[in-house]
Structures are given as structure tokens and as C-alpha cells.
Regions:
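Glycine- and Gly-Pro-enriched alpha-helical subdomains that act as flexible
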Residues: 103-120, 124
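Solvent-exposed alpha-helices and their adjacent loops that cap or buttress functional pockets
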Residues: 6-8, 49-52, 74-78, 97-102, ...
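Phosphate/pyrophosphate-binding loops at sites that engage ATP/ADP/AMP, CoA/4′-phosphopantetheine
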Residues: 124-138
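Short glycine/threonine-rich loop-to-helix capping motif typified by GTGT followed
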Residues: 146-160
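Short internal beta-strands
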Residues: 137-145, 165-167
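Conserved anion/nucleotide-ligand pocket segment
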Residues: 1-67
């Protein structure tokens, strides 16, 4: 918030968190830069406290690692404190797990002509829950271009403020 406000009023933000002062990995800033949702700010604070205490913390990820890990963070799938970068909110490999959920999921939805918003929700929402997918990680919905006039589909997408894309059947 301080950085956004400073930009609006043309000021220099001064952010002094313990991780910043000690030049340690700041999970909240990293998540924001990478379009991820933090499941629990309490867990994020506990994670930062572990870093400040000099502890090694773990990283579990469903995604490839494409750069060097920050100091004190090691790749592992269990331990006391760590990050889990995953689309599945049920994955908690550490006693204190900071789940980072990338906003990168698109739903493919087909429906019969005249299908209502409520009917789509009745089918889609329980399936997402079963798969452990948080609604905040969904970016949009895709469907075949034959469905571009389906009010129920548009109502569903609008309700959750998602994008919608249509593709040809080819």
C-alpha cells in the first residue's frame, strides 16, 4: 500500500519491515510481483520470523524452479516452516506452511443452450472444492465460440470478475 500511495502522490516510499532491513526474502512482496495469493498472513509472519531467527525454511513447489533460491530457503517437501507454491489448497507439507497460489487457472466450460448461472455454479464450484482450487486463483473461462451468446455463462464469469475467451471448435 505504501508503494502504491507514494506513486500516486509522487513521493518516495519508506518501507521498514524486519525482512527488508535485514535484506531477507519478503514473501509478501515476492507473491505480489508474481501474481500469487498468500493463503495466510499469519503463516507469512511466522515464515518471516523463522528467516529472521536464522532458520532454514523449506520450499515445496508444483512448478519448475527457474532461478537460484534465496538464502535460507531450500527445496524440500516437509519440515517445520516453509512455502508451498501450488494450485491445491490442501497441500500443506510444513508444520507452518505459507501457501502461495498462482493466479493462473483457466476453466474450460461447455453448457447446453439456456443453462443458468445457478446450474453452472452447482456443477463447477463443488468440483473446484474437490480439487482444492481456490476461486481467487482463477483468471478466466474459455468455451467454444458456439457459446458466445449464452447468458448463464456470461453471468457466471461476471459474478466472479473473470475473463472469458472463445475458441473455434477446430
Amino acid at each position: 500500500f505504501a508503494k502504491a500511495l507514494a506513486e500516486v502522490i509522487k513521493a518516495t516510499p519508506v518501507v521498514t519491515t524486519a525482512t527488508d532491513v535485514n535484506k531477507l526474502f519478503a514473501v509478501d512482496e515476492w507473491a505480489a510481483r508474481n501474481n500469487m495469493i498468500i493463503n495466510s498472513m499469519k503463516a507469512a509472519k511466522d515464515f518471516a520470523a523463522a528467516l529472521l531467527d536464522g532458520q532454514e525454511v523449506g520450499l515445496f513447489t508444483d512448478y519448475p524452479i527457474i532461478s537460484a533460491l534465496p538464502r535460507q530457503i531450500v527445496l524440500k517437501d516437509k519440515g517445520i516452516t516453509g512455502l508451498a507454491i501450488t494450485k491445491n489448497r490442501n497441500v500443506k507439507p510444513f508444520d507452518v506452511t505459507v501457501q502461495l497460489w498462482p493466479r493462473n487457472i483457466y476453466l474450460g466450460i461447455g453448457c447446453r443452450r439456456g443453462t443458468t448461472l445457478e446450474s453452472i455454479e452447482t456443477l463447477v464450484l463443488p468440483k473446484l472444492k474437490e480439487l482444492g482450487i481456490d476461486l481467487r486463483t482463477i483468471v478466466g473461462v474459455a468455451s467454444v465460440d458456439l457459446k458466445k451468446d449464452e447468458a448463464g455463462l456470461f453471468d457466471f464469469v461476471a459474478k466472479y470478475n473473470w475473463e472469458i475467451s472463445f475458441f473455434t471448435a477446430e
